Amino acid sequence: MQVGIDIIEISRIKRAYERYNRLFLKRILTESEIEWCLNKPRPFESVAVRFACKEAFAKAMGTGISGELSWQSIEILNDKEGKPTLFLKQPFNGLKSEQVKLSLSHTHEYAVAVVIIEPDK
């Protein structure tokens, strides 16, 4: 089992967006994630928690975001009930999305993500 955790101040995400606008979002999110976040009442919290989740996933993998693992290759989408799920848009180390468990949370100030990667059965 591998575990990764990340926390970020939502104000950092907001400042980056104010400086770079949609270019910032396009760098760290997929189009589906951008659409979902921008339709939320507090979009910066949604963006920040996805940023934290991608960072936590990279930490759990022990690779960081670079090379094969890019911001765009990881996608966090919510199902009809609102449960977030991590999808890999391209194969990475033989990992299946079903092996990845997420716990995401945020306040008005911080977003936090915990990622657990279970061994393949």
From Swiss-Prot:
Keywords: Cytoplasm, Fatty acid biosynthesis, Fatty acid metabolism, Lipid biosynthesis, Lipid metabolism, Magnesium, Metal-binding, Transferase
Electron transport among keywords: no
Catalytic activity: apo-[ACP] + CoA = holo-[ACP] + adenosine 3',5'-bisphosphate + H(+)
Keyword Lipid metabolism carried by entry: yes
InterPro entries noted in UniProt: 4-PPantetheinyl_Trfase_dom, 4-PPantetheinyl_Trfase_dom_sf, ACPS, Ppantetheine-prot_Trfase_dom
Tree of life domain: Bacteria
Coiled coil ranges: none
Needed cofactors: Mg(2+)
Transmembrane segments: none
GO CC terms: cytoplasm
Subcellular location, record wording: Cytoplasm
Example of a GO biological process term: fatty acid biosynthetic process
Entry EC no(s): 2.7.8.7
Single Gene Ontology MF annotation: magnesium ion binding
UniProt: Mg(2+) binding residues: D6, E55
Principal location class: cytoplasm
Enzyme class: transferase
Described purpose of this protein according to its UniProt entry: Transfers the 4'-phosphopantetheine moiety from coenzyme A to a Ser of acyl-carrier-protein.
Family to which this protein belongs: Belongs to the P-Pant transferase superfamily. AcpS family.
Name of the molecule in the record: Holo-[acyl-carrier-protein] synthase
Protein source organism: Chloroherpeton thalassium (strain ATCC 35110 / GB-78)
